[in-house]
């Protein structure tokens, strides 16, 4: 399966008419894979990214601020972890106070922007601009994408520290604040698909990012734009084979 996936990905990269979408879900970023994703951007191996808010904010942006994830145990008592202000992603630990500092940074960036509607792509681009001057750890996916003009979309953006930070921002600015326009975001991603002669998907995990990028074909059809289905697809997952809508396709 790995050899077959590598062959398909080589075909994507060799196809000059193909736009490559990378989708990220799950905890591979906290597990140490973010440098790999940054390299895909750096070496022009992907054209757009669709990710969960957790992957982009709670893992990538969080570490760019100088914070870390720690190897722990999946068997640790959660009540004890809570007493010590430690959050857990299976066997990976996060300092809750550091996460709240990340929330506050999101709030601060939002406070600095013109109060209007932004797509997650536009807001993440502002985070990339912020990291250019303020990152404690260079080479994050957000900053690398900013440097290489690769858009990052997070359709479930508020399901992360971004959500907490933006709630704080709106609480502090009840009459004039920013909002996230998820409808325009779908339109933006669909336009990338429409303008692409061919497209390929490199999907890590499933969930919202996988569904969102696949929905671009349907969305294009509904607004009267004729597009082909995605020509290439690779999904890296531990899920069992089942209905395509909900889990992984058959090899």
Regions from the PLM with identified roles:
Residues 59, 210-214, 241-245:
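Short active-site-adjacent structural elements
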Residues 228-245:
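Short, flexible loop segments at boundaries between secondary-structure elements
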Residues 1-66, 72-80, 84, 88, ...:
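Metallocofactor- and cofactor-centric catalytic cores in central/energy metabolism, strongly enriched
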Residues 80-162:
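Ligand-binding beta-strand-loop-alpha-helix segment within the catalytic cores
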Residues 246-251:
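Conserved small/polar residues in nucleotide/adenosyl-binding loops
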